[in-house]
Amino acid sequence: LGPQLNKGCATCSIGAACLVDGPIPDEIAG
């Protein structure tokens, strides 16, 4: 999909997962 799903990668406790795996919602990645 797209980065619009990454609503809080920067604030996510494991936000790096958003960058590694791609467009993961912070609700899931965090």
UniProtKB/Swiss-Prot annotation:
Summarize the thermal behavior of the activity: Thermostable, retains activity after heating at 50 degrees Celsius for 24 hours. Activity decreases over 70 degrees Celsius.
List the GO cellular component terms.
extracellular region
Taking the first listed entry, what is the main subcellular location of this protein, grouped into a coarse class? secreted
Q: Which UniProt keywords apply?
A: Antibiotic, Antimicrobial, Bacteriocin, Secreted
Q: Could you tell me the Gene Ontology terms of the biological process aspect for this record?
A: defense response to bacterium; killing of cells of another organism
Summarize how pH affects activity: Active from pH 3.0 and pH 9.0.
Query: Which InterPro entries does this UniProt record tie to the protein?
Result: Subtilosin_A
Subcellular location per the Swiss-Prot or TrEMBL entry: Secreted
Superkingdom is Bacteria
**Secreted recorded as keyword:** yes
**What is the role of the protein in this entry?**
Bacteriocin that inhibits the growth of several Gram-positive bacteria, especially the food-borne pathogens L.monocytogenes, B.cereus strain ATCC 11778, B.cereus strain ATCC 21366, B.cereus strain ATCC 10876 and B.cereus strain ATCC 14579. Likely to act by disrupting the pathogen membrane resulting in leakage of intracellular constituents. Does not inhibit the growth of Gram-negative bacteria.
What does the sequence similarity comment in the record state about its family?
Belongs to the bacteriocin class V family.
Quote the protein name from its UniProt record. Answer: Mejucin
This protein's species is: Bacillus subtilis
